[in-house]
Structure formats: C-alpha cells, structure tokens
C-alpha cells in the first residue's frame, strides 16, 4: 500500500495515470482527484471505462463533462456522471 492507502499501481495503471494528465485545467479538475483517490481502488470495469474515456479527444471530454454531448458508451457516461457528482460534492465540503 502507498502512503494514501492506495494500492501500488500496476504498469498498466501507471500508463493510464500518466494519460490522465491532460493539461486542460477543466479536465484536470476532475481527473487529478479521481486518480489520486478513487481510480486504484475502483472495480476493473470502471478502470476499463476510464481507460476508454482517455482515448477520446480533449474537446470531446470537455463536452461530456459540461453536458454538451455524451459518449455513446453508457458505462462511460455513467462514469462521467459519477466523477462529476463526486468531484462537485468534494468541492462543497
């Protein structure tokens, strides 16, 4: 276990964590805390949805997180909403 009670990431998880660094402040608002606090302990299906999400272009991701459009994949859309809800509730506390 790492210092923040997260398991040590596998090489594949490290690759995904690296890919989550987008450089777009609006996306980093969601991705950085998710990676730090939830990703490594998420179910395998959620981790796969997150990996799939990262294959999308930044403008598309921004549209998903601002409700301008939605991905075709329902699991990915559910994850977008989970991350948004979690992150916004975290911001208020």
From Swiss-Prot:
BP terms from Gene Ontology: succinate metabolic process
Lineage: Bacteria, Pseudomonadati, Pseudomonadota, Gammaproteobacteria, Moraxellales
Protein family membership: Belongs to the SdhE FAD assembly factor family.
Function statement: An FAD assembly protein, which accelerates covalent attachment of the cofactor into other proteins. Plays an essential role in the assembly of succinate dehydrogenase (SDH, respiratory complex II), an enzyme complex that is a component of both the tricarboxylic acid cycle and the electron transport chain, and which couples the oxidation of succinate to fumarate with the reduction of ubiquinone (coenzyme Q) to ubiquinol. Required for flavinylation (covalent attachment of FAD) of the flavoprotein subunit SdhA of SDH and other flavinylated proteins as well.
GO cellular component: cytoplasm
SUPFAM superfamilies: YgfY-like (SSF109910)
Stored Pfam families: Sdh5
Signal sequence, start to end: none
Subcellular location: Cytoplasm
Superkingdom to which the source organism belongs: Bacteria
Gene: sdhE
Protein name: FAD assembly factor SdhE
UniProtKB keywords: Chaperone, Cytoplasm
């Amino acid at each position: 276990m790492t210092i923040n009670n997260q398991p040590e990431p596998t090489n594949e998880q490290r690759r995904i964590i690296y890919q989550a660094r987008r450089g777009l402040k609006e996306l980093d608002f969601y991705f950085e805390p998710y990676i730090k606090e939830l990703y490594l302990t998420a179910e395998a299906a959620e981790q796969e949805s997150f990996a799939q999400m990262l294959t999308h272009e930044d403008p598309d991701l921004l549209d998903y997180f601002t409700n301008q459009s939605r991905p075709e994949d329902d699991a990915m859309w559910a994850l977008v909403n989970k991350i948004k809800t979690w992150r916004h509730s975290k911001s208020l506390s």
